[in-house]
Amino acid sequence: MSSPSMFDRISSPRQRLSNPLRSPPIREVSEYDLDELEPRSDDVLFDQEPPLPRLKKNMQHVSATSTRRSSSPASWDSKHRYSNSPPHTRSKPIFAGPPPPIASSMMMNQHPSRQSTVSSHGDNGRGYGLISASRFGSNSPSQKHVDNRPRLDSIWRSLQRREKALERDIQQLLDLQASGLIAGSGEGSESNFGSDTTTGESTFYSTATSKSRMMNSLHMPTRSTPDGNVIPVRQPVSNKPRGLKSTRVGLQRSMAALSDLKAEEDLHLSTALEQRKDALAYLDKMSKRRDDIYSELHALEDDEEEPLGQELRSLEAERQELDHDIQRLEEKLAGAKKRRRWVREKMEDVKGRREAGLSGYRAAGRDVDIEVRTLMQTPPIAPLDIDALGYGENTRPKENMDILRGTEFLQLRPERRTVEMARTWWQGEIAALERRKAQISQDRQALIEGSEVWSDVTGLVAQFEAKLRELVKSSQAGDADEEPQQAAMQSQLSEMDDVVQELQKRLQLAESKHWNLLICAIGAELEAFVEAKALLSDTLGLPEPAAAVDSPELSDSTDKAEGTSQEERADSHDESDNEVPADLLVSRMEDHDHDPPDSPQQQSVVLRRGSAGNNEVPVEFLADLHGPNKIEQDTEIAAVTRLMSK
């Protein structure tokens, strides 16, 4: 079940306080056969009367606990599903609710006192609001045990698991991309690895396999019960290999999913920061209020210029003077005694008024002390899991090692917790969350910039492949002369040099910003272009330029990409859980919004992938129109086109 929301936690303090006071009634031990169970009557959820027991025979002693447990969602579903069918045609449902808890009933009968304790702990485990009565009010007198165990927020580990899953998907897509590019640059030019269309052989194999599965047995298994309950059937896993086009699209989608995950984590971080800042502000407000009250109280007690204090001192002096006058003047004894009686009454009145004024401050100070003590016993914020935010034991900043963590604060006895400890705890968590938020913003910016770079790379590749494909079509049609075609192919070589230079610039940009994901992807595209260029140069019989082949930047970037891929492959092989290494996605790229279906980039990609294997004219049809040299040249040009399409 999901944790209660902020509004649910704020709006239900009475219900949360009243639940621990109510313990379920003790159920007598009863044992019966499970075959005698049947669904509840149709009006369990809507009648005001208590539900009947689930046994066919009359049972006199049925506890409220078993009655509540029998009202499971499965029983509600079966009740509504079979409510319209006649009772004589209703068959026994597949699942009519859980059986009565025999073993747990015996344990609860042996330990009746533990039920209330467990229920109170379970109620305390729910979410707390910042202004709930259980946090800042007085606790219930019947709640004797306080659960001091730290409860961590599980959303951070959930986000971490989702991020690791996306990283594994990205690693698989990178492996598929490398496999597709290697297969496209291999000797077998007619290999269709990674193509989006299936061959006749694979179709026949899948058809034969499906027929063998269907005809394995003459007995057809039951798909559903007579009442309409569908029996689930395990579906086979699709073994169809993904093509290079789908791999690139998958990389784009994975980057978009990773960007959405970062946005969600940023939202949770903002919420956590706001909660802790509110708690810290409330704590500062209470501390300031208490300090103001006590400072004013001490100032009033020690103020010699206070009117009531001065009046009290003057009356005391007058009383002493009157006592002396009584001793000296016996004739004035009657008047002096009367005056003394009046002065004493006046003193008592002044003392009472003064104490009444100071008692209000003392009561307010005691209330604040009680509220702060309650806040220290049950803090409104769950401890922050520093490890789930990406800080391991070795990568944790030095300042995080010195701060007081929430788990350490909650492990202390409540009477030993102080306001300074709570302030140190929340200030440290706020600093950690702010650092994580800054890192998330930096990662999102890197993802946006990297996605733009990848879009430029795919656009360059698609534009060049479209031009090369048009040239191959014109050469295979046989309408143009050989010399203009030779010049066009040489111009394609120069354009290929430009594309290689642009890819090298993008690769250098990715290396300068340590974008390992783009280094792998762009390096693979660059290597494919270099191989295609070499093949095209050999076809035309032109010497390959030394700058393009022996470029140190290209060799360094290619070696670096290959070394990174080999290290990542070795690390992923050594790890038992097949996780993506942490340094592969140091700067994770966030994909921009998906292009519309009619955008130039998607059209170029679709054109490059969709027309790669369908618009090629077989060499045999050109044997009558061209000589042997022309056929050989067209064959090699078609091989270059297929290599670029891979």
From Swiss-Prot:
- Where, per UniProt, does this protein localize? Cytoplasm; Vacuole membrane; Cytoplasmic vesicle membrane
Q: For this chain's UniProt record, which GO biological process terms are given?
A: autophagy
User: Where do Polar residues bias regions lie?
Assistant: 12-21, 106-122
Q: Where is the composition biased (Basic and acidic residues)?
A: 557-575, 588-597
Q: What happens when the gene is disrupted?
A: Does not significantly decrease the growth rate under nutrient-rich conditions.
Regions of compositional bias (Low complexity) in chain numbering: 63-75
Keywords associated with the record: Autophagy, Coiled coil, Cytoplasm, Cytoplasmic vesicle, Membrane, Vacuole
| Topology relative to the membrane | Peripheral membrane protein
Function summary: Required for the autophagic degradation of peroxisomes called pexophagy, but not essential for general autophagy. Involved in resistance to elevated pH.
**Record's protein name:** Autophagy-related protein 28
